[in-house]
Amino acid sequence: MAGLGIRLSAGDKLIVNGAAIEFETDAHLRLANQVNFLFGKQIMGPQEATTPARRIYFALQTVHVGTLEEREAALRDACYFIDMFAAETTSHIARNLLAQTKQAAETGHGYQALRLARRIIRHEDAVLSV
């Protein structure tokens, strides 16, 4: 059977097209259709969105795996957070990553936008720890 196989442990979380699933036992599942999903450490809770980069990631997470009703508002939020961060930062690296992230989000490439947002978080962490 074709598809993407995922192995999850008891307590792991998976979000598929807006549905949050928590596994009570170890499981192996196969996603046979094209779906938007995140699992494990890819999922950020609202209490973790404590910095500008993390707020961008959290909004993009909803763009990627939220319900249809949530996605439009989340994209507006993500673009707002990206624009605010870009206006405030002096880092050319951050501005470049922010521009790429916004373009990916606006063109429907949610997972790519999340990967770029993780790079922005790492950059932000490195700058703030100096």
Language-model segments: what does each one mean?
Residues 1-130:
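Terminal leader/tail segments of proteins
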